[in-house]
Amino acid sequence: MYMRTRYFIAGILLLALFAGCSSDSGEGDAPGGGSGDLYGYVRDASGSAIEGVVVSDGYTCTVTGADGRYAMQRHPNAYYVYYSTPADCKVEVDPSTGLPLFYQKIRKSQAQYDFTLTRQAEETKFRMLAIGDPQVTTTAQVYRFETETVADINSYVAAQTDGLPTYAITLGDIVGNKWELYPDMVKAMARSKTSVPVFQTIGNHDHEFPQVTDLSAQRRYEASFGPVNYSFTRGDVHFVSMDDIIHKATGSDAYTSGFLDWQFEWLKQDLSYVPRTCAVVLCVHIPFRGGFNGAGETYFDEVLELLAQFDRAWVF
């Protein structure tokens, strides 16, 4: 989206308090193109199975059984296999990047992908910070992001005396069509810098072009930040981050807003595992109100109907 506000010092758009309900280097076989079974086990650090964890390839969602096993038919375009972090498990952080780690890259030659989660008591209260439109275009702006926005986050977290866990999520446009700055922004948002795990949402300026398809336009982003449609739960709040940019990709930054049919199906499946008494927060880049209102918008009404099934739901 064209910059709603280019904030660095005031980069924290939302401070919300809610009350509670293995890393891959990216080297090797190219993902996609396979249709074989995709399966694995989700266990805790002691090796015990964790039942009821939702696992996805970005197209299909399934859930682990009593033995911790999940299985699904891999979609040909699937790039990652990943889990939705349950409320009673820790947000794992990649030791090399410092960002949340809940996914593994899919390889044609590999069918089994196991995950180890760390159990914890379910949080009854926590804080979530939202960061909007850093949209950096130079290393100097990355430096400002680190010394102003990240510094503000650290100051805010340090000032809290109640000991509540704190998380953060970006709301898109991490860069302004300068995709070579992704590694710098990964470093800037590492937990060692921000003091909190920072989840990501893709924006229109995060799609690389020219590319052949909308999917290929998001691959460079995914290689740095992970899946573009995913979820996690803290307390009784289920967070969903989605790509609501349908990018033309071929030769310009033209796009429309909305969701594709397979994204809507993925969201339906993800939410089918969430109790209706839970709150749902959908994080997207293009606002459902007051944002880009193009003729190409798709599935906005259907998504709102899905969210209306829950006692509490918000779109950020």
Model-derived features with residue positions:
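A short, solvent-exposed beta-strand micro-motif common in secreted/extracellular proteins
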Residues: 74-95
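Bacterial signal peptide processing site
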Residues: 22-25
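Long, structured stretches of catalytic cores involved in phosphate-ester chemistry, encompassing
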Residues: 277-316
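Extended active-site neighborhood of metal-dependent phosphoesterases/phosphodiesterases
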Residues: 87-92, 100-105, 180-268, 272-274, ...
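Structural motif
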Residues: 30-51
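C-terminal motif of bacterial Sec signal peptides marking the signal peptidase cleavage site
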Residues: 17-20
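N-terminal active-site segment of His-dependent metallophosphoesterases
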Residues: 33-37, 88-182
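Short, acidic Ser/Thr/Gly-rich low-complexity loop/linker segments typical of extracellular
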Residues: 53-74
